[in-house]
Amino acid sequence: MIVLSVGSASSSPIVVVFSVALLLFYFSETSLGAPCPINGLPIVRNISDLPQDNYGRPGLSHMTVAGSVLHGMKEVEIWLQTFAPGSETPIHRHSCEEVFVVLKGSGTLYLAETHGNFPGKPIEFPIFANSTIHIPINDAHQVKNTGHEDLQVLVIISRPPIKIFIYEDWFMPHTAARLKFPYYWDEQCIQESQKDEL
């Protein structure tokens, strides 16, 4: 039996979200044949021991806390990302749900609906510590640290591994967006898996 105390009803939303993420991680199935796996025992891991990199994107620190490729997760994937001031995600969309929990810092979410031929001018939403963001499926978006300190977010996606379509700008046609799969943090493991299959 697992007992997870999250305090009173007035507990921080971060504690609640992180607790739910830990439960999902605990009850998820692991795939022993997953490439580059960090799976099996121990179920509880020290987050400081997980791989962290910027994957060629200055100002980004990415860590897959629980993922499909690295840990064998089937339904959700959880990342911890830190953006230095001025750094940003590419303009992109994906066919999965995405939720951000802002742990610290501030920034801007740029979000455009994708019902036309191209995203168009995005709507700007300020984001800040203890705010949550829900990205609708296939809506083009970008997160940028527009603050003066690091922006740290916990990101939860559905249906991993993620397949991302990247735009050069907000007026690039959807049909011209470039598919990036596997995504940067899954590349090495998926390439090693393909080599093993030959």
UniProtKB/Swiss-Prot annotation:
Residues involved in Zn(2+) binding: H92, H94, E98, H141
Top-level taxon of origin: Eukaryota
Query: Recorded GO terms, molecular function?
Result: auxin binding; zinc ion binding
**Taxonomic lineage:** Eukaryota, Viridiplantae, Streptophyta, Embryophyta, Tracheophyta
Q: Where is this motif: Prevents secretion from ER?
A: 195-198
What is this protein's expression induced by? Answer: Up-regulated by auxin.
Q: How is it modified after translation?
A: Glycosylated.
Tell me what the record says results from W185Y: Slight reduction of activation by auxin. Slight reduction of activation by auxin
Q: What is this protein called?
A: Auxin-binding protein 1
Query: Membrane-crossing residues?
Result: none
* Disulfides per UniProt: C36-C189
Any GO BP: signal transduction
**Record note on what altering P90L does:** Slight reduction of activation by auxin. Slight reduction of activation by auxin
Enumerate the glycosylated residues.
N130
Complexes and interactors: Homodimer. May interact with the GPI-anchored plasma membrane protein SKU5 and its family members. Interacts with TMK1 (via extracellular domain).
Q: What is the effect of changing L60Y?
A: In abp1-9; lower auxin sensitivity and altered responses to continuous light and shade
This chain's source organism reads: Arabidopsis thaliana
Membrane topology of the entry:
Peripheral membrane protein
Q: Which UniProt keywords are present, listed alphabetically? A: Auxin signaling pathway, Cell membrane, Disulfide bond, Endoplasmic reticulum, Glycoprotein, Membrane, Metal-binding, Receptor, Signal, Ubl conjugation, Zinc
Signal peptide range in chain numbering: 1-33
What InterPro entries does this protein's entry cite? Auxin-bd, RmlC-like_jellyroll, RmlC_Cupin_sf
Stored Pfam families: Auxin_BP (PF02041)
Gene from which this protein is expressed: ERABP1
Q: One GO cellular component from the entry?
A: endoplasmic reticulum lumen
* Cellular localisation: Endoplasmic reticulum lumen; Cell membrane
SUPFAM superfamilies linked to this entry: RmlC-like cupins
